[in-house]
Amino acid sequence: MTTNEKLIKSADRVKDHGEVFTPKWVVDKMIDQPEIAAKVRSLTATFLEPSAGEGAFLVEILDRKLKYAAELSKSAHEFGSYALMALSTLYGIELLEDNVEMLVMNMKDTFSDNYRELMADLYKKKPDQKVYNSAKVIIRANMAQGDALKKIDAYGNPIIFSEWQPIGKTKVQRTEYTFEAIVNGDGPTGTVHHAIEEIPLDLFPDEEPETFGETSTRHFLPCKWTDIYKEKIE
């Protein structure tokens, strides 16, 4: 553990919420386990962290997945799609608001820094703004403030999960389901149990909390990975 690495924020938070952060050396050791490392080197294998904190695990996995996406890419455009595909496989739920804010910021920073640097190093090009815009939507959809055990978000509404299903190499189909529907076996495919999460609406003050009725699914039009930000609904 590094000398400046804090494992707790306060004794009260440990007492009230059991909050203890994982040191980086432990994160690295866990991700280096063969069964985990193999999934990290996959653009479609998904990870859910039900108590995500500030994103120690998710950020490290994202960093490694983006580098793997770069290895597979043969062009700047392909790298943009693969980078978004890698990002779409990572999901987090966190109870505490300040942690969720840091989680979202850390995921955004990790994606943007890696994408910008790899674009410059590999292709001598500037980042595509559409990739940034689409990454923001994915992170907003995949990082939820809520209670994973109760399956509710910060507003008491059902946690919503998005399945990002690749269509070939360049397109994606997004489908949203309540966590309850997934737990009950009503998911759209046999892979949704890998977990696909969503919307900490309070993190984006220009958006209003959404109240969910009886409908358990919402369908988005298939689109290019780089057009996810348009969020066109079927």
Model feature map: region roles:
Residues 2-234:
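SAM-dependent methyltransferase catalytic region
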